[in-house]
Amino acid sequence: VESIIKDVKGDYIYPSFIDLYSDYGLPKAKKGEYNYRPQYESNKNGAFHWNESIHPEINSAEQFVYNNKQATNYINSGFGVVLSHKQDGISRGTAVLVSLSDQKEQKTVINDKAASCFSFKKGVSMQKYPSSLMGSIALLKQLFLDAYWYQNSNNTTNLSFNAFNNQFDLPHVFETSLVTDYNRIYQISDEFEIDFIIKGNGKEYQRIEEIKSYEYPIILPLNFPLNYEINNPEESDILILSKLKHWETAPFNPRILSENGLNFCFTMSDLEKPSDFIKNLRTSIEKGLTKKDALHALTLAPATLINEENRLGTLEKGKKANFIICSSDIFENGKIYENWTNGIQNIVNEKTENDVRGYYTFTSENVSKTFTIT
């Protein structure tokens, strides 16, 4: 294998980051045509589950296609690998672990079945049921019961149950929309003796003692609320205290999880602007998250959660060539020069040949001025 030697004296090098909650490279789910008659049965042909929001047979790897625009957003923020799944329905099927390199899919797919994914969201299904959170929970519990029963059944074939039963050895990722979803997931986890990795919602601080007791690993978004613009007294009356409290406390959420000993990693999911990721990450550090914990949450923690710590997450011989080169400490004001994914160079910011950054003092007679070039 040919090697490349580069002089990066004075630069900072980190392992490329890993995002465990993405829909990168996958088509968006689309709703069917509206029918004024209520739909109670599945319109999906084949020996599948009777409800369209239950589709564990979906294998995201079979639908994955490289997407340059999405990949660029991730690469510019320091990511090299993402776990991608089709974010639709309650039982969503398997996620694919992929490199963000601009290569054929045969080269970028790292693990075609890296996790199975769940939520309480019905998705684009046009069936009447479920029509509530309670219905979604009941349907998911029934799926577990039916799949267990199916293991000993010889008189029927159900491809959804087949797929579901084959996923028990995979990591299980469960999306939350509300902070109260943690308890709902725990009830399912406890009843069916299954562990979950929780995709969080940024409000974990509100019930930290309860969440701490569950000991779930958490995929944490950095979707901090923007500043509220209040131009007159009437607008201030509309703004409720809970929103102001969340605006103030949300940036402390990673620190609070860390101080309570919870295992977590970061995701770009839920950000309106992908470019805000590094900015919000630095805000978390300003609010008390240590740089060591931040780096762990971006690299080795996610790699370990999906059992890929032998190939990803650190800069070691034998691991994939995924790393970023930065001008200085990325957790302060470092600029990403290059992001190498799968051994392929991606230029993020051009590096000037003559680096003129620094402090300069200009003296003229009795006047002395100091300037900073960053």
Go through the PLM ranges and name each one.
Residues 37-49, 57, 171, 221-328:
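His/Asp/Glu-enriched, well-ordered alpha-helical/loop segment
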